[in-house]
Amino acid sequence: DVSFSIQQGEWVAIIGHNGSGKSTLLRCINLLEKPTDGKIIDNGKNVLERGYSLPKYRTHLGMVFQSFNLFNNMNVLENCTSGQMTVLKRNKEEAKKIALENLEKVGMARFIDAKPAQLSGGQKQRVAIARALSMDPDVLLFDEPTSALDPEMVGEVLKTMKNLAHTGLTMVIVTHEMEFARAVADRVIFLDSGKIVEEGSPEEFFTNPKTDRAKQFLNTFSYESV
């Protein structure tokens, strides 16, 4: 039972305990799971209404998963071009140019011939980010992008995401990285038992939480600078 809006160019961090519904909410936004009720309004139109083009809606959304979801039989470059050619109908040269630009952004351009099995977890996630960016999404969704990584690899992925800040891209990030959320988000949504318990700016939420539930949640974390 949630209701919120996202403005163009805004970075929204969704936080909460495990099982609070964070990932389910994200999957409902891009309709990997269909909501049982309610509305999802995109540019004034309800995407859940009959007749609305879901494939067209999904082209506006990029998603970065916990477990990378790269194609193991493809190299890094192919992972970043296949969707462009299949879904966006770009030719091979155009797709390659865009993929290389985005791989450069995430520091993975020199690994274009590597297969996923040859990469570390942090490198795989950076490739996944480049792949999502290569589809030119209006909104980029991150589902706990560091949760499957070894601790020493978390920083490189967070740094990559931080470098995307203020580029005009709209981002919704489900994360347990509290200091990261505090540093880069424009707004924080605290979810508990499938409901929005508190919502506000990072400064408001992290320094002066209004609800006891949010206070209890924050007391379980110690902050380190990202």
Spell out what each predicted region is:
Residues 1-202:
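ABC family nucleotide-binding domain
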Residues 203-226:
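C-terminal boundary and immediately downstream tail of ABC-type ATPase nucleotide-binding domains
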